[in-house]
Amino acid sequence: MNSANPSYIYLVDDDASFRSSLNGAFISLGYQVKTFSSADEFLAHPDIAWPAMLISDMRMPGKSGVELQKKLIDETLGIPIVFISGESTLEEAVQGLKQGAIDFIQKPFNMEDLLQTIEASIEKQRQNLAKKYKSIVKEERLARLAPRERDVCMLMVKGFSNPKMADDLQLSIETIKQYKQNVFGKLGIEDLAGLIAFMHD
């Protein structure tokens, strides 16, 4: 686990010894862990750091695991959930999975299986976060362009020649050339191949 890019596990279970055992195991593997004795205690937590995984018991005093899941859905907090339980019914397990749980694991369980599930989910989150960040950076760079410069940029990517762009945009060829220079300069891109790669990324 890369400590420079930590992953977070939120553990909700009313069994103190079970929480302590899993907490120690996860910390030893480099995860940042926060534990909670009930669904309500978790819901009172101010925020969630990402990438993250919620591991929850199904049956607890107060809100059940499924009720906690429903509350998170209602609040559009899409944290991936793995349910771990030794007493749940098949109906509860099916309901949790239908509501989007990553997995349902019965006690006793194989720790390696749980870790594989967690890491697969967190890796997927990392990839999604990287794509989202790249998209934000791209939009910030494109926002540097004036409207006409963006028009020229789009036509460049489509392979339009200078005369064709000038005709379509009702501009002079010299103006088109200037806009093209502006596009490369403002986006920090050296050539057309780089621009095409940037726009299609």
Model regions and ranges:
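Conserved acidic segment of CheY-like receiver
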Residues: 3-18, 22-26, 39, 54-55, ...
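Acidic, metal-coordinating helix/loop segments flanking the phosphotransfer/catalytic sites
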Residues: 35-53
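Acidic catalytic/metal-coordinating carboxylates
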Residues: 37-38, 64-68
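Active-site residues of response regulator receiver
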Residues: 57, 85
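Receiver (REC) domain active-site loop signature in two-component systems and cognate sites
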Residues: 60
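C-terminal output helix
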Residues: 89, 105, 109-118
